[in-house]
Every structure is written in structure tokens, then in C-alpha cells.
Amino acid sequence: MSELQGAFLASIGVGLVLFVLVFIFEGRAFSKTGISKYSLLRYFPFELNCFKRNSKLSYVYPVVTFMGTLIISAAFLFFALETQNNGGAITVAYIMFAVSCLTGLVFNALTFIKLSNYQLHLIFAVLFVCLNLLEMILSLFFLPNTNYVYVNAPHQATQIAVFIVTFLLLIFEAVLMFNPSYKRWNKMVKVDAETFNRPRFNYLAMLEWGNFIIYILNLLPIGIVMFF
């Protein structure tokens, strides 16, 4: 294992640990408010922290989340550096790194923008989806292509694995995007206040959290290329 491969794995591990810890602690704090248990299927990313106003602890969630996304995006940088060492197409690799950084920043913005500013929140949610789609398209079209030296010609199994994983991620994204319930959003949720009624399954929140999961899983194709 090369140093860059080790750094790639370390960045993913540290980033995931930070995300898990912040979700556990913030989720427990949310439950103590007496509202209900925090659920990824019902509550938005910004709601994990919105109840701690004018508190020093309110800065923990955005700071740790920013650090986590920064470290996760660093994995794409290590992939770009490994590609450069192997004589691959570094331009695409660095573009993927840049897209990952932008995606992380947009998610961090979603942890601040409340539904009281509904249009801005929706703009960032759409941008979050589009950046994830761009990352997957780059993986699908460039990583399995031997002309860009990401995968050596004899490694057909690696090419197939990258294609299948990326295609499955695209299907997951399509399921999140093309949910018929979005058409009934105004009937299901009152959006003119920060405190509102909502269904058991909040599909816009699911779209945001689902794309956060995709943001993490986008590391799988480049991980396959780096190690196989």
C-alpha cells in the first residue's frame, strides 16, 4: 500500500468517525428537547442544530461537519495525486476533487439555511443534487475508460466494478429525485414557518440526507480504481 492509498483510507475513516460522532451527540441533544427522536426520514440537516440558539454548543455541529466534509474531500485530492504519480489524466481527477469540495460546502450551507428562507433552501438542495450527479457522471465516463489510465487495460473486472457501482448510485439518486410525492409537497407540509406539521416521511429531507449518503458513497468508484 502506498502512502497516498493509506492517506486516502485514513481521510475516509476520520471523516466518517466525525460524522457519526456529531450525529450521535446532536441526535441525543435533539431528543432531550422533548419534540421527538431525530430521524433522517423526517427532519432536515439544519434541524439537528437549530434548537440551540445563542449557545456556544451551537457551533459544534457546523464546525465538526465542515471538518468532516473537508477531510472526506481530501480523499479525492489523494486520488488525484495518485493519478498524477501513475501518469493518468490528472485534469479530470482534480475536477472531481473540486466538485467534491463544492458539494461539501453546499451541504454545510444546508445545515444553516432554514425553511423560513424556503427558496434559498430549495436552491441549495437542487445544487447539492446536481453536484452529486456531476461527480457520478465523471466517475461513470472517465474512471472505467482505459484511455485515461485510471484502470490498466487487463483489469476488466475493475472497469466493470466501477461501472456497476456508479450506475447503482445513479439509480439511488433517481429514486430520490423522481418521487411522486414532491408534487403533493404543499399539501403535506406547511412551509411558511420553522415549526410546522409534516408527514412521517419528509421527502425533501430524505432527498437532502440521501444525497449526503451519496456524497460519501461517491468515494467507492475511486477507491476501487486506487486499490484494484
Feature-to-residue mapping (PLM):
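N-terminal signal-anchor transmembrane alpha helix
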Residues: 4-33
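Membrane-proximal helix-loop-helix units in multi-pass membrane proteins
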Residues: 97-162
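Hydrophobic transmembrane helix segments
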Residues: 25-50, 225-227
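Physicochemical signature of membrane-embedded alpha-helices that form the seven-helix bundle of GPCRs
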Residues: 8-14, 60-67, 96-102, 124-131, ...
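Interfacial helix-start motif at the membrane-water boundary
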Residues: 47-70
